[in-house]
């Protein structure tokens, strides 16, 4: 038995088979279509699927969750598999990625919504605003990410950004901009300590005030 299997069984439960099929899609068509690097195949479970799924510890039952810059479906798809009670929206601007997501979601039969667009676009904010949480992984620095996330979530909603070992440094660097963008209770937390070594590192923040219309669109650069 692989060291990953007990953790995967605990996290995905009876839907582990769906997680396996998703991993196969990432390792096959995902690599062939340039959505996953070939060197990532050997660590899909610990570094990608499980690392993403465990942030469900920070979500409430029935939450509407927007995955910003979903790419190949991370972290949104592992969350949707592990937590079928969640209402997961995969937000991704690139056509080739949304095509992959639609094919994969249809094959898996998981209940997720796919939206092709960017977080800073007004129509996206109109459609997805008021969500309970915005999640992301490897999308952008925290200053931009906060400006993109806050307009999509309700007051007191959560921003959950999966980060690496520099998470504390990044929070120190961007805290002022994050607060100016409406974030409160900004902190670094870990998830999955019972299953992963090391556990997933997440920058957690809440939306603490009303966001000025268009604040996200003033962020320089484009979103993934």
From Swiss-Prot:
Residues annotated as binding S-adenosyl-L-methionine: 69, 74, 119-120, 137
UniProt keyword annotation of Translocase present: no
Compartments, record wording: Cytoplasm
Chief location of this protein within or outside the cell: cytoplasm
Gene Ontology MF annotations: rRNA (guanine-N7-)-methyltransferase activity
Knocked-out gene: effects: Confers low-level streptomycin resistance. Seems to be an important cause of resistance in resistant M.tuberculosis isolates.
Domain of life: Bacteria
InterPro entries membership: rRNA_ssu_MeTfrase_G (IPR003682), SAM-dependent_MTases_sf (IPR029063)
GO CC, alphabetical: cytosol; plasma membrane
Pfam families in UniProt: GidB
Keywords: Cytoplasm, Methyltransferase, rRNA processing, S-adenosyl-L-methionine, Transferase
Secreted keyword on record: no
Enzyme Commission number(s): 2.1.1.-
Family assignment from sequence similarity: Belongs to the methyltransferase superfamily. RNA methyltransferase RsmG family.
Function: Specifically methylates the N7 position of guanine in position 518 of 16S rRNA.
Protein name (Swiss-Prot/TrEMBL): Ribosomal RNA small subunit methyltransferase G
Species in which this protein is naturally found: Mycobacterium tuberculosis (strain ATCC 25618 / H37Rv)
């Amino acid at each position: 038995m692989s060291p990953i299997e007990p953790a995967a069984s605990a996290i995905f439960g009876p839907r582990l088979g769906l997680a396996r099929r998703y991993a196969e899609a990432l390792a096959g068509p995902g690599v062939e279509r340039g959505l996953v690097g070939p060197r990532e195949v050997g660590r899909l479970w610990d570094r990608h699927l499980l690392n993403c799924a465990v942030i469900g510890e920070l979500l409430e039952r029935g939450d509407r969750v927007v995955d910003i810059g979903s790419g190949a479906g991370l972290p949104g798809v592992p969350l949707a598999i592990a937590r079928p009670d969640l209402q997961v929206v995969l937000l991704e601007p690139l056509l080739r990625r949304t095509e992959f997501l639609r094919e994969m979601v249809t094959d898996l039969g998981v209940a997720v919504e796919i939206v092709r667009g960017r977080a800073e676009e007004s129509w996206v904010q109109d459609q997805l605003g008021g969500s309970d949480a915005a999640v992301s992984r490897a999308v952008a620095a925290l200053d931009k990410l906060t400006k993109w996330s806050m307009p999509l979530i309700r007051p007191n909603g959560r921003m959950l950004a999966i980060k690496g070992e520099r998470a504390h440094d990044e929070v120190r660097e961007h805290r002022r901009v994050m607060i100016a963008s409406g974030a409160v209770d900004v902190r670094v937390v870990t998830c999955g300590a019972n299953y992963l070594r090391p556990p997933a590192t997440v920058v957690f923040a809440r939306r603490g005030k009303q966001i000025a219309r268009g604040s996200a669109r003033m962020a320089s650069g484009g979103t993934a």
